[in-house]
């Protein structure tokens, strides 16, 4: 598996191209992502959104049309693609597939799991491909996603942290902002955040 990364826009939101067996999955195409994605993908299969915030989905519509590929988004965040609730001027897009909580999908023989971790947003997910976890704004290196936005939920975030702490397997985490880390390296940080939410 090959993973390309490019921070995008004012908030340096990480856009990823995850390539498995020659198949490209575009994860969180944010502000200005189109040119970079078009230059670095050869066999695009789908756009995968970890959640619906504008800086993660800004280029959804443009890329979907240019590449003729579908958009997969957690069902509870699809309204954000359509309505721009934070009023940032994000281009409207529509999910071709509204992903259920903890749903496993198979695309071109590649297994992808949308792990449900609400809190930062109602439908916030971490997308698993092999032993890699694209965590969006759920987990960062040494931190977690904010829970003071409209539609955020501190209580849901606590449940999500307890959920991920119950996992026995380790994963390489590719977050929505900042550098990669390992789940095993974030356990102490995650436990401490439970006291501050």
Residue ranges and their predicted role:
Residues 27-29, 45-52, 71-74, 115-119, ...:
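Active-site neighborhood of phospho(di)ester-bond hydrolases with catalytic His/Asp-centered motifs
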Residues 31-107, 188-192:
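Active-site HxH/HxHxD metal-binding segment of metal-dependent hydrolases
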């Amino acid at each position: 598996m090959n993973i390309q990364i490019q921070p995008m826009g004012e908030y340096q939101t990480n856009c990823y191209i995850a390539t498995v067996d020659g198949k490209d999955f575009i994860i969180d195409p944010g502000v200005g992502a189109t040119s970079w994605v078009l230059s670095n993908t050869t066999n695009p299969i789908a756009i995968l959104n970890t959640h619906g915030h504008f800086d993660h989905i800004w280029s959804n519509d443009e890329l979907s049309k240019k590449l003729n590929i579908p958009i997969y988004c957690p069902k509870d965040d699809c309204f954000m693609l359509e309505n721009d609730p934070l009023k940032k001027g994000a281009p409207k897009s529509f999910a071709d597939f509204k992903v259920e909580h903890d749903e496993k999908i198979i695309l071109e023989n590649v297994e992808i799991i949308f792990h449900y971790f609400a809190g930062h947003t109602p439908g916030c997910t971490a997308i698993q491909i092999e032993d890699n976890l694209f965590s969006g704004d759920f987990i960062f290196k040494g931190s977690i996603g904010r829970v003071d936005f409209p539609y955020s939920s501190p209580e849901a975030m606590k449940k999500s942290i307890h959920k991920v702490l119950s996992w026995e397997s380790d994963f390489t985490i590719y977050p929505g902002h900042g550098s990669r880390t390992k789940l095993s390296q974030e356990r102490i940080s995650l436990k401490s955040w439970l006291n501050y939410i």
